[in-house]
Regions:
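Short, small/acidic-rich helices and loops at N termini and domain boundaries
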Residues: 1-57
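Glycine-biased, small-residue-rich flexible motifs in mid-sequence functional cores and linkers
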Residues: 38, 43-46, 50-172
Length: 172
């Protein structure tokens, strides 16, 4: 699909054949297409962008290197494929030392074409994103619970700061 080797009709035929071969499993392509169209309308209304894996300019290219990449992402803001992605992970219950080290680490890296990636969760994720925003570095977040479930809630402002600074947040 991503390499456009098959047209839409071919794709529908292949998918229908694969699914219908499963014993006792019926698939209604029209129902699925209607559901997808409704989701697209909701995304447009809510200001949610849809990123498709075959959109090489906008989809996170690093995700195409994993064994089971998502076919589609939903997000707010933009993804930066021009900078090297660097994931920052750590404890939600960080120590003062961990907080200091994370800030120092991200501040130092902000001098380079690095894209700080984290989960916008409490603790180290928050420190990494906030430090990146404060330093003018690129940062993006991947949310585990969906776009409408920023947790902790107080990070909603940080999510907007990420967008305002040229980044974004995304989910499957």
């Amino acid at each position: 699909i991503a390499t456009n080797q098959h047209g839409e009709k071919d794709l529908k035929s292949i998918v229908y054949q694969l699914i219908s071969e499963k014993e006792g499993f019926g698939f209604n392509w029209d129902k699925a297409a209607n559901r997808a169209a409704k989701e697209q309308v909701i995304c447009q209304r809510e200001g949610v962008a849809i990123f498709y894996a075959n959109d090489v300019d906008n989809f996170p290219s690093i995700l195409l290197e994993i064994s089971d990449p998502p076919v589609v992402l939903f997000g707010r803001g933009v993804w930066n494929n021009k900078k090297v992605p660097l994931s920052v992970i750590g404890s939600r219950k960080m120590t003062n030392y961990g907080k200091h080290q994370c800030r120092h680490f991200v501040e130092d890296l902000s001098q380079f074409p690095i894209n700080i990636i984290s989960g916008l969760a409490m603790g180290i994720d928050t420190v990494a994103h906030q430090t990146a925003v404060d330093c003018g570095a690129s940062t993006q977040a991947f949310l585990a619970g969906g776009l409408g479930h920023i947790s902790p809630k107080r990070n909603t402002l940080l999510a907007q700061q990420i967008i305002d600074s040229g980044g974004g947040y995304f989910t499957e």
